[in-house]
A protein has these predicted regions:
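Acetyl-CoA-dependent GNAT
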Residues: 9-10, 23, 36-95, 107
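Helix-loop element at the rim of GNAT/NAT acetyltransferase active sites that forms part
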Residues: 6, 18-35
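Active-site acidic-Proline motif in GNAT/NAT acetyltransferases
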Residues: 91-96, 100, 128-129
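Conserved short alpha-helix immediately C-terminal to the canonical SAM/SAH-binding motif I
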Residues: 106, 130-133
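Conserved catalytic-core motifs of GNAT/GCN5-like acyltransferases
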Residues: 123-127, 138-155
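Conserved acetyl-CoA pyrophosphate-binding loop and the N-cap/start of the following alpha-helix
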Residues: 97, 101-109
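A short beta-loop-alpha structural element at the N-terminal edge
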Residues: 3-17
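Conserved GNAT acetyl-CoA-binding A-motif
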Residues: 107, 114-125
């Protein structure tokens, strides 16, 4: 059974490992395989979570099965008065767990947080060829607003 919860700070290393696994499992996350390990640390991630999520600015939820973190969704709220009503979304689900409704549940829970926190615009970036993600986003009400050519180079 999948359980959805806030990330407990004592699970930060498990979350770090999930992020690194997602980086190697798919070509569609921002980091190249092993790039995250070279550019940041578990401690930096912990500070980010403490400063932004635990303080209530951002949303972060994980999905677990048998105590293993299998996916997450994060919404990073705008930091200025003019964009404080927006949040940028990142979602990652291990390949084995895709197509099981985890993404839809994440978005339903995110919508509740957004309404409670006066977020009126949720946004994200997806590669044109990532049809699985595009279908999930469109199913959850997202619309394509434009194409950013040459914004990412995937090796």
């Amino acid at each position: 059974m999948i359980i959805y919860s806030k990330l407990e700070i004592n699970r930060i290393k498990d979350f770090w490992e999930l992020l690194n696994r997602l980086d190697t499992e798919t070509d569609y996350m921002m980091y190249e395989p092993n790039e995250r390990k070279a550019k940041t640390t578990v401690q930096e991630l912990k500070l980010d979570i403490q400063d932004n999520v635990i303080q209530g600015f951002d949303f972060l939820q994980v999905a677990t099965e048998n105590d293993k973190i299998v996916g997450y969704i994060r919404a990073e709220r705008g930091k200025f008065e003019r964009n404080f009503h927006t949040a940028y979304i990142v979602i990652g689900i291990l390949k084995k767990y895709r197509g099981k409704g985890i993404g839809t549940t994440f978005f339903n829970n995110l919508d509740l947080w957004a309404k409670t926190n006066n977020i009126v615009r949720l946004e994200l970036t997806v590669e044109c060829c990532n049809n699985t993600a595009k279908n999930l986003y469109e199913k959850n009400g997202f619309k394509i607003e434009g194409i950013r050519k040459k914004s990412m180079f995937v090796a």
